[in-house]
Amino acid sequence: MTHGTIHSVESCGTVDGPGIRFIVFTQGCPLRCQYCHNADTWEFGCGRSVSATAIIEEAEGYRSFFEATGGGITFSGGEPLAQPEFLEAALREAKQKGLHTVIDTAGSVVPKNIDQILDHTDLVLLDIKHIDDATCRILTGRSNANTLAFAKRLADRNIPVWIRHVLVPGLTMTETFLRQTGEFIRTLGNVERVEVLPYHQLGVYKWEALGLDYPLKDVLPPSAEDATAAQELLTSYLS
């Protein structure tokens, strides 16, 4: 029986894929995003150990909500692709049970069994941290090369994708970078939706609890007008 390590679950999520969803937050992430609101999911080797079978059985308790709303199960994190064997096993069992499956990922980790994982995935929420590699390294500690290559792989397999992009003043919120992101999205052909996520500071207390210095403490969230403009700009590249 395949086991994984999770941070927590959310029984009735409504923002990580279509419908009402059972969200599994896996434990462990190789990125160190400066705006991360779940810094407590970074560390590997801690969290709750659970079998793929057990987590799908737990999700099945909400089947009536899924069927009424077109929902299902979403694997988020942390970085779910950092636990590839567990993810593949859980997704396989979910599909065997007839559940709609979503992976919420930054695509920075591409495991050897990625094609087997995608065989059981209905939708990918792909977070493009930054289209510029140098800035991405500053923002996350990692290159964006794997993310962009993963996006192209998803396009080649014609797996539906929702692109996510966190709007951070001074880092991601420039027209040049937004247009470059849009031009990349336009090349893919399988992107159903773009979601601009306005930067916020709701996770600062987690950094403080972990004894970490929050690097963006002086950065204010974008205005509603700026967020709307960015959303409209990126969405225009889907047409």
Which ranges hold each PLM region?
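N-terminal/domain-start segments enriched in small and hydrophobic, helix-friendly residues
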Residues: 6, 30, 41-43, 154-161, ...
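Short, conserved loop/turn and helix-capping segments at secondary-structure boundaries
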Residues: 49, 141-144, 221-224
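Conserved AdoMet/S-adenosylmethionine-binding subsite of the radical SAM
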Residues: 56, 60-72, 76-77, 81-202, ...
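Auxiliary Fe-S-binding modules of radical SAM enzymes
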Residues: 1-13, 169-239
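Short glycine-enriched, charge-decorated loop/helix-capping segments at active-site entrances
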Residues: 40-44, 137-143, 211-219
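Canonical Radical SAM [4Fe-4S] cluster-binding loop centered on the CxxxCxxC motif
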Residues: 2, 8-10, 14-50
